[in-house]
């Protein structure tokens, strides 16, 4: 496609030397006593576009809600392209206009799925999993999304370069909940956690198994 003959890929990287120096300076390397039981650093996408659409017909809204719920049950596979049939997209296009010109290399369905549905699914998934875990353990939420629930403590945002690695080091377990637009690759957050010496608890991503040993280097 587009005249490209070869594509080479490497997973994202992390500057372990810089982070180790930071952890050493802050005296968090090798600490047996952790400050947080389970931590999550990230957005809850509570202002996602899909939930702002309040004018869809009931049958269309019901169908989209249903396929979002179905997708939420599956990790490492994207079923939305198959379920967003042409008749559904044609009707949807009458209500939701996307500013697309000929320079766009994606379809209307793909753009709507990535911008609207997948952030909505990620929002539902993150809130539901945090609520579930909050019933059995203490959760430390570091986010711009101010959200409270049983067992969940809100700590605001953290600086990516200097504060976030310390959170991962000071947590017994660190959650990664991959945004649904990343179907198979390793999210940067996984590398952030592992690079800071934290225990990674993540949803399944095919590429994680290609580079790391499950239940030894990360848990799912």
What are these regions (language model features)?
Residues 49-59, 114-121, 154:
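Short, flexible/disordered intra-domain loops and linkers
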Residues 1-102:
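Catalytic core of nucleotide-activated saccharide and alditol-phosphate transferases
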Residues 27-32, 125-134, 165-167:
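A general structural signal for short secondary-structure junctions and capping/turn motifs
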Residues 89-136:
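Alpha-helix-centered segments that form part of catalytic cores
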Residues 36-40, 137-140, 173-174:
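Hydrophobic beta-strand segments of well-ordered beta-sheets in folded domains
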Residues 2, 132-136, 196:
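Alpha-helical structural signal in soluble globular domains
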Residues 3, 10-12, 120, 141-220:
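Catalytic binding pocket for nucleotide-activated donors in carbohydrate/polymer assembly enzymes
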């Amino acid at each position: 496609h587009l005249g490209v003959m070869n594509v080479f890929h490497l997973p994202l990287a992390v500057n372990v030397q810089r982070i180790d120096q930071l952890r050493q300076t802050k005296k968090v390397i090798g600490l047996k006593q952790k400050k947080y039981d389970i931590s999550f650093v990230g957005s809850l996408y509570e202002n996602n576009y899909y939930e702002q659409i309040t004018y869809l017909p009931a049958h269309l809204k019901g169908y989209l809600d249903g396929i979002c719920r179905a997708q939420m049950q599956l990790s490492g596979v994207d079923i939305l392209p198959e379920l967003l049939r042409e008749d559904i997209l044609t009707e949807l296009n009458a209500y939701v206009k996307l500013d697309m010109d000929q320079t766009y290399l994606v379809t209307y369905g793909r753009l709507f799925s990535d911008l609207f549905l997948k952030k909505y699914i990620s929002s539902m998934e993150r809130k539901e999993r945090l609520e579930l875990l909050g019933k059995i353990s203490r959760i430390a939420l570091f986010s711009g999304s101010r959200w409270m629930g049983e067992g969940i403590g809100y700590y605001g945002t953290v600086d990516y370069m200097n504060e976030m690695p310390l959170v991962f080091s000071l947590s017994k377990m660190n959650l990664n909940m991959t945004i649904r637009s990343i179907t198979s690759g390793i999210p940067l957050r996984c590398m952030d956690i592992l690079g800071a010496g934290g225990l990674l608890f993540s949803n399944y991503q095919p590429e994680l198994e290609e580079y790391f040993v499950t239940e030894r280097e990360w848990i799912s």
